[in-house]
């Protein structure tokens, strides 16, 4: 990656001037301290305090992802940031207004340097910055490198996780890139969000959402695509007596999860080992001063 492009992308990521009301940036909904998730509201808020339908997802290890957004609407990271920039609810800008601003701003004239000030170069710079969001320094990673040994509780939780959760949240990413699944949540009648089907147009994709990574999940509350669950304990309890219908990508059929109260505590203990403190506190991810 080009360090100058990464620096430009970082500047763009945190610039509120790229929103129509001058108050919203990418970093406003994606905080580096929470693995680039949005913890202030169940669903993201954009310009003029407009409320979206979904929770802003965490951003990490994006180089290994093949689709972006909860519904997989974007297929390439270089294009992803264009969606929030131009969405009416989020940043509400037009391509022309963005380009005019960048070309007339002395700071961006310097930041682009010899590169053409263009939308493709802007998008590529943001993507280059986001590609640096690599999380690999958790207690789980140290265990895998044989640098630490799990406690008995963490080990029990790990075994339970592998048996019950790993089919969707597979190691080492703790997600399943390119896979969309239903976890059985009832649709919020006010949001009327049909998930993947809104992109594919296929009835069988109704209420399917991208399987998110669970790395740093301790920090990425609230949970689910619409932020309806506040704690990991609540999430694990929801899944603890559940029969899930697996999508074809995961082999189809049913997946039955049964966890008692003690086992739920063990699973949460394991999930806490996925927290990467260095990632959450990395100064190179934070807003430039």
Question: What residue ranges belong to the model's regions?
Answer:
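Periplasmic c-type cytochrome electron-transfer domains
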Residues: 1-289
């Amino acid at each position: 990656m080009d360090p100058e492009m990464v620096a430009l992308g970082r500047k763009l990521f945190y610039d509120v001037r790229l929103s129509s009301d001058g108050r919203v940036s990418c970093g406003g909904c994606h905080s580096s301290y929470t693995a680039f998730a949005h913890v202030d509201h169940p669903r993201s808020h954009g310009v003029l305090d407009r409320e979206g339908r979904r929770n802003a997802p965490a951003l990490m290890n994006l180089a290994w992802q093949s689709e972006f957004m909860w519904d997989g609407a974007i297929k390439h990271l270089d294009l992803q940031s264009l969606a929030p920039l131009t969405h009416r609810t989020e940043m509400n800008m037009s391509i022309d207004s963005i380009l005019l601003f960048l070309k007339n701003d002395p700071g961006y004239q310097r930041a682009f340097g010899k590169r053409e000030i263009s939308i493709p170069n802007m998008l590529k710079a943001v993507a280059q910055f986001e590609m640096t969001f690599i999380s690999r320094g958790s207690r789980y990673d140290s265990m895998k490198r044989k640098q630490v040994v799990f406690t008995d509780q963490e080990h029990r939780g790990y075994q339970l996780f592998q048996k019950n959760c790993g089919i969707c949240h597979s190691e080492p990413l703790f997600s399943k890139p390119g896979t969309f699944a239903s976890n059985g949540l009832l649709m919020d009648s006010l949001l009327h969000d049909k998930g993947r089907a809104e992109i594919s147009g296929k009835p069988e994709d109704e209420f399917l959402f991208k399987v998110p990574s669970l790395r740093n999940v301790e920090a990425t509350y609230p949970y689910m695509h619409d932020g309806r669950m506040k704690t990991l304990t609540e999430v694990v309890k929801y899944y603890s007596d559940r029969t899930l219908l697996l999508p074809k990508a995961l082999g189809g059929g049913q997946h039955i999860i049964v966890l008692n109260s003690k086992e739920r505590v063990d699973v949460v203990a394991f999930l806490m080992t996925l927290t990467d403190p260095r990632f959450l506190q990395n100064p190179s991810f934070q807003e430039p001063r």
